[in-house]
């Protein structure tokens, strides 16, 4: 499919979609599943074959029925009304914007978002996403295939501070942290505590402690949340742009509108609603079980 024309109207619709995403995520407490949708759409990228990536293909049944994507049809359906109100936006952009907003609304860092991803109808083969039952070698195989680094692996794993696992989707059950709708560095703090009653630690989580290269980032992020936020924002941006080359030229307002003015506005709103999101989160988790 052709790349979208990112003109003034496209940017207006991105801004509108951002506002609607804030409202949806705040009212439904669905930040975890929106982050998971963004991750799983982008995380299929293969740097060698230049296939997969953040291209919106996860909206097709062929892909959302992959075992690793169980439950994500919920997020896809929740986003359809927003897509209808901002029809120029590609699904690829919408899904990545949803992940960015999910992090910010729950108190996490601002992740730079540049629009222009093209949609694809070509679904990658199953098996490109991480298997939670495996270890460090598997994590490197998956993330290096995307073109990402050890630091990216650990920083992005910190996204497990949001949400919980459900047995019908992953075979595992439980949240990683005490406040699964608050984005902070508690994932790493809990990881260093060892086994905690009621909290989840996947084999891939434990691998971060056992591998020396991974472990140094775990220790760093546990003691320095600011550094975690900085590194996470950089790694999330890289993930969200897999298979996409942001515009390097064109209207000066394209990048500045989204990376400066809009960021200031979204940050202010995000701080205001973060507390409310945490309060309502457990009610939503109980009723919807959205990861």
From Swiss-Prot:
Membrane topology, from the record? Single-pass membrane protein
**Single Gene Ontology MF annotation:** metal ion binding
Specify the superkingdom: Eukaryota
Q: Which reaction does it catalyse?
A: L-ascorbate + H2O2 = L-dehydroascorbate + 2 H2O
Transmembrane spans: 263-283
Q: What class of enzyme is it?
A: oxidoreductase
Q: Which UniProt keywords apply?
A: Calcium, Heme, Hydrogen peroxide, Iron, Membrane, Metal-binding, Oxidoreductase, Peroxidase, Peroxisome, Potassium, Transmembrane, Transmembrane helix
Task: State the tissue distribution.
Answer: Expressed in leaves, stems and flowers.
Which parts of the sequence are marked as the site Transition state stabilizer? Answer: 36
Coarse class of the primary localization is membrane
**Intracellular or extracellular location(s):** Peroxisome membrane
Q: What induces it?
A: Down-regulated by hydrogen peroxide in leaves.
**Keyword set includes Transmembrane:** yes
- Annotated residues that bind heme b are located at 160
The catalytic activity of this protein is classed by the Enzyme Commission as: 1.11.1.11
> Cross-referenced InterPro entries, in alphabetical order?
Ccp1-like, Haem_peroxidase, Haem_peroxidase_sf, Peroxidase_I, Peroxidases_AS, Peroxidases_heam-ligand_BS
The record's listing under CDD domains reads: ascorbate_peroxidase
UniProt GO cellular component terms:
chloroplast; peroxisomal membrane
What else does the entry mention about this protein? Binds one cation per subunit; probably K(+), but might also be Ca(2+).
Q: Which PANTHER family match?
A: L-ASCORBATE PEROXIDASE 3, THYLAKOID LUMENAL 29 KDA PROTEIN, CHLOROPLASTIC-RELATED
Q: Can you tell me which family this protein belongs to?
A: Belongs to the peroxidase family. Ascorbate peroxidase subfamily.
Question: What is known about what this protein does?
Answer: Plays a key role in hydrogen peroxide removal.
Q: What is this protein called?
A: Probable L-ascorbate peroxidase 4, peroxisomal
Highest lineage ranks of the organism? Eukaryota, Viridiplantae, Streptophyta, Embryophyta, Tracheophyta
């Amino acid at each position: 499919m052709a790349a979208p024309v990112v003109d003034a109207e496209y940017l207006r619709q991105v801004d509108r979609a951002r506002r609607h995403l804030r409202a949806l995520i705040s009212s439904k407490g669905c930040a975890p599943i929106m982050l998971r949708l963004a991750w799983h759409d982008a995380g299929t990228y293969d740097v060698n074959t230049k296939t997969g990536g953040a291209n919106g293909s996860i909206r097709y049944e062929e892909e959302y029925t992959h075992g690793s994507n169980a439950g994500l049809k919920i997020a896809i359906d929740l986003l359809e009304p927003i897509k209808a109100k901002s029809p120029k936006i590609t699904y690829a952009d919408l899904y990545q914007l949803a992940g960015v907003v999910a992090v910010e609304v729950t108190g996490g860092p601002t992740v730079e978002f540049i629009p222009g991803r093209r949609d694809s109808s070509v679904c990658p083969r199953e098996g490109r996403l991480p298997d939670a039952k495996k270890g460090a070698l598997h994590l490197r195989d998956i993330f290096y295939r995307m073109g990402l680094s050890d630091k990216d692996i650990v920083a992005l794993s910190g996204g497990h501070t949001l949400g919980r696992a459900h047995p019908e989707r992953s075979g595992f059950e439980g949240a990683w942290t005490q406040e699964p709708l608050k984005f902070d560095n508690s994932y790493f703090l809990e990881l260093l505590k060892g086994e905690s009653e009621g909290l989840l630690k996947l084999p891939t989580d434990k691998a971060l402690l056992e591998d020396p290269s991974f472990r140094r980032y775990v220790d760093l992020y546990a003691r320095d949340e600011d550094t975690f936020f900085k590194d996470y924002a950089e790694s999330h941006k890289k993930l969200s742009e897999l298979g996409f080359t942001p515009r390097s030229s064109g209207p000066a307002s394209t990048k500045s509108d989204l990376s400066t003015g809009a960021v200031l506005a979204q940050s202010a709103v995000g701080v205001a609603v973060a507390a409310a999101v945490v309060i309502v989160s457990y009610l939503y988790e109980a009723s919807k079980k959205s990861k």
